[in-house]
């Protein structure tokens, strides 16, 4: 009887421990989900200052890696190869993005954005969403939003399709066409085409920038607008 009672007590203790472990795991998941939601909400709040400017039509240049292309018939062509999760790409965009926008809107240069996805699944989702925004004529502002909320940790779970749709809505892209395009991954073939074309153009990392076919290299650790601007103007 004593042995049976002891065995019963051991079983009871074991189930209590299992239940406690399960509770800790479930609680951790719940807090993790709520924590991620809070972080997402806080990040999206940083988009409050980004409002859609007039739409700018782009095309997909399949001869140049399925780049999102703004062809203005200008003498200068700039190719930008980037991955949306790349922190150095954010540095480049923070320094030179507004200047590139003005070149496009004022038709002073042709600009091709090659959106890559080699940093992981979230890069694929962000690139797909970027192509979807381009279909709406709103790539430039969505591009700005991407870097405004870029996570400091790659593949952190931040860039879900839902978050990318919410990003679009936050800056004014509210069409069901955009939402469907993002959630269905409608542009992943174009995303893959960009990645497949890297070797053809000698691209080994991001950001990589070409001005009239010549690779541009910064001379300082930081990206300096005046340096990039001078290189563009020199052609």
Where are the regions a protein language model picked out?
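C-terminal cap of thioredoxin/glutaredoxin-like
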Residues: 1-48, 169-235
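A short beta-strand-turn-helix
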Residues: 58-76
């Amino acid at each position: 009887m004593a042995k049976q009672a002891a065995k019963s007590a051991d079983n009871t203790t074991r189930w209590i421990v299992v239940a406690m472990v399960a509770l800790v795991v479930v609680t951790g998941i719940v807090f993790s989900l709520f924590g991620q939601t809070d972080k997402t909400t806080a990040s999206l709040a940083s988009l409050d200052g980004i409002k859609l400017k007039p739409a700018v039509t782009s095309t997909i240049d399949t001869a140049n890696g399925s780049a999102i292309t703004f062809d203005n018939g200008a003498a200068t062509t700039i190719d930008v190869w980037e991955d949306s999760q790349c922190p150095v790409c954010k540095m480049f965009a923070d320094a030179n993005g507004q200047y590139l926008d003005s070149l496009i809107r004022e038709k002073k240069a042709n600009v091709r954005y090659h959106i890559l996805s080699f940093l992981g699944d979230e890069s694929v989702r962000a690139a797909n969403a970027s192509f979807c925004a381009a279909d709406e004529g709103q790539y430039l502002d969505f591009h700005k939003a991407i870097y405004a909320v870029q996570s400091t940790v790659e593949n952190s779970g931040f860039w879900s399709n839902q978050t990318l749709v919410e990003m679009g809505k936050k800056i004014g892209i509210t069409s069901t066409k955009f939402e469907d395009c993002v959630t269905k991954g409608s542009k992943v073939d174009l995303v893959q085409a960009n990645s497949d074309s890297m070797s053809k153009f000698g691209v080994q990392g991001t950001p990589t920038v070409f001005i009239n076919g010549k690779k541009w290299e910064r001379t300082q650790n930081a990206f300096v607008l005046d340096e990039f601007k001078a290189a563009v103007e020199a052609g």
